[in-house]
Amino acid sequence: MGSDWDEIKRLAADFQKAQLTSTLQKLSERNCVEIVTLLLEKQMLEVVFTNDGKEYITPDHLEREIQDELYVNGGRANLVEVSKTLNVDLSRIEVLAERIAAENPSVHLVLGQLIDEDYISHIAQEINEKLVLRGEISISELASQFDLPSDFLQHDVVEKHLGKIIKGRQDAANPRVFFTQAYIQRCKAKIRGALAAITRPINVAVILQQIGVQEKIFHSLLDEIAPAGQVTSKLANSQYVPHIYAKTQADWVNSFYKQNSFLEYDAIQKLGISDAKSYIRKQFPNEEFLFLKRVALGARLVELTVVTALNECSATKQYLDLTTILPSNLSEEDIEEVFSTIMAQKHSNPSNFVYLDSIVFSQPYLAQLVQPCQALAESQAKAAIDGGVYQQYIVEKTLAQKGNASTQELEDDGKVDKRDERRKKASSGKAGGGAQGRETKTKSTKKHQRGKAAAHNDSDDEDDVQQGSRGGGGVNKKAVKPLELVKTADIVKLITASLEEEGLEHLSKPIAALYTNQFNQTALARAQELFEATPQTNRRQTHAAIQDRINTLLIDIRLYEKGLKLFPQDTQTQLVKYLLKSLGNDICNELSLYVAGECNLTVKNTNLNVDQRNKLAQECEAQYRAALLEQNKALNKSIDEFELATETVLKACSMIIKKVDKKKDRLLIADHKKKLQKQLLECQDPALLLHLAALILFTAISGSILHASGKFVSAILQHIRGSLNEEQNALLLRYHDLVLQVLQATPDSSESKMANEHLQAMQAQVVELAQNFSRASVSKAD
């Protein structure tokens, strides 16, 4: 029974063993691949394939292998190298590396590298050894050495282990620099020793070069050392000035100022102080200074000496020599600057003084000095009235004002149509052949007429040529020279004797110049009073002046008429119209204004047109009215009719027409030609030059003068053509064509520039022809 039970137990054990025992069956490679693929498809398994695809590994195992690589490489592993070693794609390595760094605080991912704390501790020990050896180290040097980011080195390596592994301190001024205490002490000792040996100002750069200390360390340790001196600045060219030297400077400046109450900038700069003004302000913070260009004056010197003396000068009505109260080494420029500054600061009233050559005159003193000049002004005014000088000045001034006003009005009225008119002239001139039908647009010359006041510019064209007055003058508007009744020399004679007594005769001319205008105006005002007090005398003199003026204009018209009669009838008609519109209009204005004065009529505008003159004539007395109206109508008729109408007006005004003196005609024509030649020599404008040359040649050939505007140049050239040889005609024709080309082209065009160059080249020939032409030379050449 017992044996059976034992058998049963044995069988039960064998059965249990059979149940627990599994059969091992080896699968083929293909079956394994299919099983893994099936697991991957059902996402029951995650693996990472190698780069060649022959192997795969789970992420957890790959992570352990990455950590193993980090350990094998001493705590610093480059992910690129790990990827090559493990034969796994870099992106998989980077993902796992980020997970490792995130899960493990002791591991850092820096620029594609895994770094653990063991490696950080290792490089901290290296940094400490280097710091002990050199005494100073910077983050930039460490970044270059370890090939790590500077921020990582500073925050996670150096600052983290500073005071533990790394024995040193951080620079407060530059946190990226670290020192050892021993290095700081050595630098302090060097700086302290060098500064203690210095007795004069020296550049900081020289000190640093000698002791071998960096500039930034020098400036950071300087305050801790508390040297016996100071550094001027922290810039490159700063200097160290020892206190002993600064004390010597200050003692000298204080002593000089105490004795003289002023300081010279040059003297301070010689002490080695570059900015003298700033040094003075710093050295004397409680003192007030008057800073000039070369010196600084103390307030005590200015207030107690100069201002007090000026006030006394004003009170006593005398003068003050500033050189006697100011330091002797001040120049005249310095003294003048002192006076100007005091006046600007209103220490005294500027209107009470006059400064001349270091001398300050009070106004009462000068007023008393020039008092005799009042009598001089009175006598000069009376002499000007008695001699008729002032009356002549009034006439010239009135005529000039009328002429200028006329020119301005005509210029304003003609602005609208000038451009179109110029285009028409240019196109019409271009259409003609040779000199036939050519019209040259030129600038105006002056009307050549005798008399002291030049007539106003005519209104025929903005560019018409007006022949210059035989009395002189240029192309511009006439300006009457101011009348000088009292001259500087007259005042000098009166005040020199008084100034010689004071030794100030060298200032007589400057003082006289100050009062010349004042006394001249006084004399003119007095002359005006005397002039207005004798209306009959003034009227007679004005009557005589206008009578001479009208006779001069009539003689001019007669001479111009002879010249224009040499032209064909159609051109002659245009020249007559132009002559009456210019000179005839002047005669009408002169007589209308004179009659208005005789009738006590007020005329606001002295430059009258035909309608204004007719209206003025209607307001005049009956004895003048008809004659003036007829004269205005005659402006549109012939020259003879105009002269007859003018004679009627002159008779009504009790004026005499001078007899014709034909003996003087040749002299007048010769004088007229000389004035044209003078204008020609001074002329640079090609169009005006051609116009003047044509007028001169016409006078030389015909023996007559001509009053013509620029549009008649073509007609003049055609008229004189027969008296010139072929070469001369060709020269004038070519010059005329070039002038038209310049006027028609735009100013900056190549065509205009080329034409101007040709004109410049031909200018001398044209001038030579006009200046030296004579009929005899032409006949000889022919």
Curated annotation (Swiss-Prot):
- Transferase recorded as keyword: yes
Keyword Glycoprotein among UniProt keywords: no
Cite the EC number: 2.3.2.-
Basic residues composition-biased segments:
443-453
Matches recorded under InterPro entries: Ufl1, Ufl1-like_C, Ufl1_dom, Ufl1_N
Q: What does this protein do?
A: E3 UFM1-protein ligase that mediates ufmylation of target proteins.
Its family? Belongs to the UFL1 family.
Q: What is this protein called?
A: E3 UFM1-protein ligase 1 homolog
Q: Which organism is it from?
A: Drosophila erecta
